Each structure stands twice: as C-alpha cells, then as structure tokens.
Regions:
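Membrane-integral, polyisoprenol-dependent glycosyltransferases
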Residues: 2-157
C-alpha cells in the first residue's frame, strides 16, 4: 500500500453528487397532487404574499391544523427562488435527501463497516416509496427527518 486514498472514496463523492442532482432535478416532473400538496403549497404562498408569517391561512381562512415549520420553510424558499412546483417541494426533498447521510452515519456509529453503511444509505436512496414521498410537498418527510436526526443524535450521546 502506498498510503494514498482509495479510488472508492472519490467514487462515493461522485455518486453522492450525482444522486443530489438527480434528486432535485426530478422535483418538477409532475404537477402538484391535490389536495395535500396544493394545500401545503398555498399556505406558505399566502404567508409569503401577505407578510403574515405568524398565522397560517388557506384561502384567507386561519388554518392551524398542522405545525407551521414546513410552511415557514417553504415560504422562505418562495422568497428566495419564487413560487413553483420545484420550490414547493424543495423543503421536503432536501430533508429526504439529508436522511441518507444520517442513515450512513448511524450505521457507522453502531459499528457497521463503511461497506454496510453505504449499502444501507444507498438502499434508502433508491427505495421507490421513500423517493416518491420525499418528492411530495407533505409533512411526512420533515417528521421522518427529525426522527432520524434524533436517533442519530442519541447514538452520538449513548454509543
């Protein structure tokens, strides 16, 4: 061995980058599904347009059925990139994508090899249902991300 880094490390970063590009590029492939995606896109739009970031509204009616974090994040994305199907889904997609390295990190943390951790993360990344849900503007992906991040954080403390 000459002490140089293995080519696999470079390949994994290239794979990670390609996955990220594909993950985000496929967001606007189809229109928003009714009723949920439209609702979770309209509430942040109304926040963004009205400037009232405290009271979520749907068609002008106060809407307190869900926690506001996703609305705030999506409205913030609208203020930077504008309103589109892509920006409506960006928060959920980003959180879904960020779960992948958390799965890898958790697997490594509990003593799995890099190979096993990579297989676990890539299995999640190519699981059809996970990818589909991550590409929908729904609250489920934020919930999944924060539960996964909590499990990973607890593994840092207790393992």
């Amino acid at each position: 061995m000459n002490g140089s880094k293995p080519a696999l490390g470079i390949g994994l970063w290239q794979l990670w980058l390609a996955l990220g590009v594909l993950w985000l590029a496929t967001l606007p492939v189809r229109p928003l599904f009714d009723p949920d995606e439209g609702r979770y896109g309209e509430i942040p739009r109304e926040m963004w347009v009205s400037g009232d970031w405290v009271t979520p509204r749907l068609n002008g009616v106060k809407y307190f059925e869900k926690p506001p974090l996703q609305y705030w994040a999506t409205a913030s994305i609208y203020s930077v990139f504008g309103k589109s199907e892509w920006t409506s889904r960006l928060w959920s997609a980003a959180l879904g994508f960020l779960c992948i390295p958390l799965v890898y990190g958790f697997a490594r943390r509990i003593g799995q090899s890099r190979h096993v951790a990579t297989i676990g993360a890539m299995t999640l990344a190519i699981s059809p249902l996970y990818v589909i849900v991550s590409h929908l503007n729904l609250l489920d992906q934020a919930f999944t991300f924060f539960i996964t991040a909590t499990v990973f954080a607890l593994s840092l403390i207790h393992i």
